[in-house]
Every structure is written in C-alpha cells, then in structure tokens.
UniProtKB/Swiss-Prot annotation:
Its EC number is 2.1.1.182. The gene is rsmA. InterPro entries: KsgA/Erm, rRNA_Ade_diMease-like_C, rRNA_Ade_methylase_Trfase_N, rRNA_adenine_dimethylase, SAM-dependent_MTases_sf. SUPFAM superfamilies: S-adenosyl-L-methionine-dependent methyltransferases (SSF53335). Belongs to the class I-like SAM-binding methyltransferase superfamily. rRNA adenine N(6)-methyltransferase family. RsmA subfamily. Specifically dimethylates two adjacent adenosines (A1518 and A1519) in the loop of a conserved hairpin near the 3'-end of 16S rRNA in the 30S particle. May play a critical role in biogenesis of 30S subunits. Gene3D superfamilies: Ribosomal RNA adenine dimethylase-like, domain 2, Vaccinia Virus protein VP39. It comes from Burkholderia pseudomallei (strain 668). The keyword Cell inner membrane does not apply. GO terms for molecular function: 16S rRNA (adenine(1518)-N(6)/adenine(1519)-N(6))-dimethyltransferase activity; RNA binding. The keyword Cell membrane does not apply. It comes from the Bacteria. This is Ribosomal RNA small subunit methyltransferase A. Keywords: Cytoplasm, Methyltransferase, RNA-binding, rRNA processing, S-adenosyl-L-methionine, Transferase. Pfam families: RrnaAD (PF00398).
Length: 275
C-alpha cells in the first residue's frame, strides 16, 4: 500500500485527521456488523470519499429517507453530493459541535444510529460530545484507534482502565468487533485500528446520578493515576463519609469499578444538595 496522502484525486488533510478506508474486505465486515436496514434513521460522521457511505446507502437509503452525514471538509462535500445526490443528506460542519439530536425522530425515543471512521485526533472529545445524545440513539459503530477501543472496553484493575472507560461504560454497553490493520487505509496510519459497537443503556438501567458530578469525581480520581485515592479524592472528605460508604481510599483509580464511582458521585451530589 502506498504511503501517498492522495487518494481518488483528493489529498488527505492532516488537520482533519483523514485516513481513507480502502480495504473492501474490511468495509464488507463493517457493513455486516452494522446491518443497515431500509428506512432507518442513520448518520455517518466523516464520510470522507464514501467508502462506507456507498454500501450503507445501498442497503438503507431511499430518496425520501436518505443517509445523513456530517462532514467538515468542503472539498469532500461537493464530491459526495455529486456522487450520491438525494440519497445522502449532508450537514456541513464540525461533528464536535453538531446537534445529533436534530436528526433523530421526534418524540425523544431511541431512533438514531450513528456510524463513522472517526478522526483519531478528536476521538475522545467526540465520544464525550455524543454522550449527551445517548437517549435518542439506538447504537453506534465506530472505527477508532485500537488503543482507544481497548481503553473503552477495559476492565478495572488493568492498565488500560481510565476515565474514558468509566464514563463510557456508565452510559453504554460496548464490544470490540473487528481489528483493522494500517494497510487498510490510504494513507496508512501509524497505529492499529478497531471497530467498536456502543449501545446506550436503557433509561431504567442507568444509575440515578448527575453525569456532571460523576465526571468531576472520575476526573479527580484519574488526575494522578499512580497516587492513592486518599490523595486524589481527599478533597471530598468534607462531603463524603468514605468509611460509611464502604469505599477504601487505599486504592488507585484504575482499581475502582463504575458502580463504586457512581456511589461516590451520588454521595457528593446528595451532600451538596442538603447544604
């Protein structure tokens, strides 16, 4: 595979994190994992040159029910419009600020499926941005840097377990599906990639906790990974009786599961509410 940044007459732009998928075997495997069906409400993030877009449109789109796509590169938008016409509804803009809820069906029930080969340089902030739309999302299938996927699905007590693990596992059930080597792209990235499936927890499965408070607690815990929680969460001792909570502070952040972080966040929020 050539290392050239040019593919199909388009130069991949580093500032957009562009690496175009060209391996048809991988594309077929991704489409098989997504299983798009006619009439579904689906949006693709960063369609690029349309390698995944075309096969998905063939299974999903009709003139009255197009595939939606969010694309920042205006050069690509013109090419995509010319190629797919009314079967693709393009939204020109940055996925990091895009209102994905605007594409969901009215009523607030899960109706939206999100797919994409996410730009690796913005993957973590984009995943956090998408969390706010989880109530209207059926599922998400993303190509990501393998190291990010490993952190997303990591278990407590492992080196890969991180703030990203806790926050995403709180909101989604996630599975790593497919490993994708660098040579599947043009130009090849310097890292391995993987496909991950993310299914939001149903509302009745979600713990009653303020996500902002949970994020605050988890961020504090992981702020100094090698230090004990007595140091990183020590500032909450005025609010939380950790002994009464059965929470051992003589551990490190990566040793604590999602449920325990939720309990601490609930205690913090309760203490603040009671003044």
């Amino acid at each position: 595979m050539s290392n050239s940044r040019q593919h199909q007459g388009h130069f991949a732009r580093k500032r957009f994190g562009q690496n175009f998928l060209v391996d048809h075997g991988v594309i077929d495997a991704i489409v098989a994992a997504i299983r798009p069906e006619r009439g579904e409400r689906m949006v693709e993030i960063g369609p690029g040159l349309g390698a995944l877009t075309g096969p998905v449109i063939a299974r999903l789109a009709t003139p009255g029910s197009p595939l939606h796509a969010v694309e920042l590169d205006r050069d690509l938008i013109g090419r995509l419009e010319q190629r797919f016409g009314e079967l693709l509804e393009l939204h020109a803009g940055d996925a990091l600020t895009f209102d994905f809820g605007s594409i969901a069906r009215p009523g607030g029930e899960p109706s939206l499926r999100i797919i994409g080969n996410l730009p690796y340089n913005i993957s973590s902030p984009l995943l956090f941005h998408l969390m706010s739309f989880a109530p209207v999302v059926i599922d998400q299938h993303f190509m990501l840097q393998n190291e990010v996927v490993e952190r997303m699905v990591a278990e407590p007590g492992t080196k890969a377990f991180s703030r990203l693990s806790v926050m995403l596992q709180y909101r989604y059930v996630m599975d790593k599906l497919i490993d994708v080597p660098p040579e599947s792209f043009q130009p090849p990235p310097k890292v391995d990639s993987a496909i991950v499936r993310m299914i939001p927890h149903a509302p009745h499965e979600l713990p009653a906790v303020d996500p902002a408070v949970l994020g605050e607690v988890v961020t504090a815990a992981f702020s100094q990974r090698r230090k004990m929680l007595r140091n990183t969460l020590g500032g909450y001792r005025d609010l939380v009786d950790f002994d009464a909570l059965g929470f051992d502070l003589a551990r490190r952040a990566e040793d604590i599961g999602v449920d325990e972080y939720v309990r601490v966040a609930q205690a913090v929020a309760s203490a603040r509410a009671s003044g």
